[in-house]
Amino acid sequence: MSYDLETAERAAYAPFFGYMGAASAQIFTVLGAAYGTAKSAVGICSMGVMRPELIMKSVIPVIMAGIIGIYGLVVAMVLKGKVTSASAGYDLNKGFAHLAAGLTCGLCGLGAGYAIGIVGDAGVRGTAQQPRLFVGMILILIFSEVLGLYGMIVALILGTS
């Protein structure tokens, strides 16, 4: 029986960190998406009392918040596909890289969801009183959405390298 030093030093708990990365990507982006959806929906509901004709036009922040959750789903599925057992060669370096990828995507999505919720709420209420604010609201929402997209791009680079 021979002793293989590389196999002996491979941590059996390395896949745990990979799966934690996949889970954190999904959990944190969905938390951000839920907050953005709820906060924007509160603004839409209070605006709909005064100007019900603007409700469909004001759904954009809710849609953009939902897209943040999809970013986390994509990264979680990519990371889940990369995690193997420790005996198949999955080491701590890969586990920590996948954890970093998941946290990057998740926390960027959480921040983007918060930003979309706050901007969506204030923007929808403001648009009800001054329709010219709509374009500015959309631009700020796009910049907020891009924060989550940046996190997904970095996570995919970290997760596949």
From Swiss-Prot:
Keywords: Hydrogen ion transport, Ion transport, Membrane, Necrosis, Transmembrane, Transmembrane helix, Transport. The record marks E145 as: Essential for proton translocation. Expressed ubiquitously. Higher levels of vha-2 are found in adult H-shaped excretory cell and rectum. Higher levels of vha-3 are found in gastrointestinal and hypodermal cells, as well as H-shaped excretory cell. It is a multi-pass membrane protein. V-ATPase is a heteromultimeric enzyme made up of two complexes: the ATP-hydrolytic V1 complex and the proton translocation V0 complex. The V1 complex consists of three catalytic AB heterodimers that form a heterohexamer, three peripheral stalks each consisting of EG heterodimers, one central rotor including subunits D and F, and the regulatory subunits C and H. The proton translocation complex V0 consists of the proton transport subunit a, a ring of proteolipid subunits c9c'', rotary subunit d, subunits e and f, and the accessory subunits vah-19/Ac45 and vah-20/PRR. The gene is vha-2. It is found in: Membrane. Vha-11 and vha-3 are transcribed on a dicistronic transcript where vha-3 is the upstream transcript and vha-11 the downstream. Belongs to the V-ATPase proteolipid subunit family. This is V-type proton ATPase 16 kDa proteolipid subunit c 3. It comes from the Eukaryota. GO terms for cellular component: membrane; vacuolar proton-transporting V-type ATPase, V0 domain. It comes from Caenorhabditis elegans. Signal peptide: none annotated. Proton-conducting pore forming subunit of the V0 complex of vacuolar(H+)-ATPase (V-ATPase), a multisubunit enzyme composed of a peripheral complex (V1) that hydrolyzes ATP and a membrane integral complex (V0) that translocates protons. V-ATPase is responsible for acidifying and maintaining the pH of intracellular compartments and in some cell types, is targeted to the plasma membrane, where it is responsible for acidifying the extracellular environment. Involved in necrotic cell death. The chain crosses the membrane at residues 16-36, 59-79, 99-119, 138-158.
